[in-house]
């Protein structure tokens, strides 16, 4: 991938950009095999990759500069701002949005937040695009609601320029820290969720729900999990850390009993909406802590699917899964180091199958799907 920002030394986020994709995949596979070296693996599936540029469906832009000349991008460690509107990881459809946002920031008087001086209002611009219909969700992260009335007043101009903006919100993040968002979300549009579709499964993206940033590879990840589950004798499964329900909604059949658990209520609202659209009445989604939910249940499903954050599922849940002993565990991980650590805490299981998904090209990061079978 050619990147003028990288070539000019202005951005180094894609550390592996000079390596061809096959070399990147080889290095990631070697890393994964090294992490799982202590465990016999029955089957290594070929790694899955997608486009090497224009694949991201989300931009997280730090706003800096002045209200007349805002910069959208990032801050270097020394506080120097860098405009990243030309980043080749973004699809071409993002360019007109960034171009319209800069004059809009001036129109609405949204002074960029100055970290050093602790002054200003506009901290971040968060943009997400749906692959299914090109609709977009735009979030303004502000320090307070001081400029809210001005923003509302100026908004019709922006909506006229960019009719693809289906969901627009303001998030209030009052803390002087590098935290992306606060708890308060104010909707400026009637529509509150972005419609997405992977493999004919309807999914919904709400402002404070996690959603994969590489749709091409994420849809293959979900489809693979579905194919693996269909090969197993499973009538009852749990989907822990389920997010908006991507895995559970793909894996469920009309006669399967499935419970999806996720701590974020926004994500659960999305999952319930999708299940209703699919007419899957035996699916239950609840906003709870996954470990607390699992350890409070009496009935044991045949399959537990886990998709934890980078920290992994942790010893308490590993201990409980070992005691509960479901026949199958599918572990989807964005951090193979913590996954390997967790598998070590599940001594009663063998690794049947492993597949790497290159969700983050040009970096050392990847996703991995692992099928564990009770010995």
From Swiss-Prot:
Annotated S-adenosyl-L-methionine binding sites: 212, 241, 262, 307
Catalyses: uridine(747) in 23S rRNA + S-adenosyl-L-methionine = 5-methyluridine(747) in 23S rRNA + S-adenosyl-L-homocysteine + H(+)
Q: Which cysteines are joined by disulfide bonds?
A: none
Enzyme class, broadest EC rank: transferase
Q: In terms of domain of life, where is this protein from?
A: Bacteria
> Known PANTHER family for this protein?
RNA M5U METHYLTRANSFERASE, TRNA (URACIL(54)-C(5))-METHYLTRANSFERASE
Q: What is this protein called?
A: 23S rRNA (uracil(747)-C(5))-methyltransferase RlmC
What phylogenetic lineage does the species belong to?
A: Bacteria, Pseudomonadati, Pseudomonadota, Gammaproteobacteria, Enterobacterales
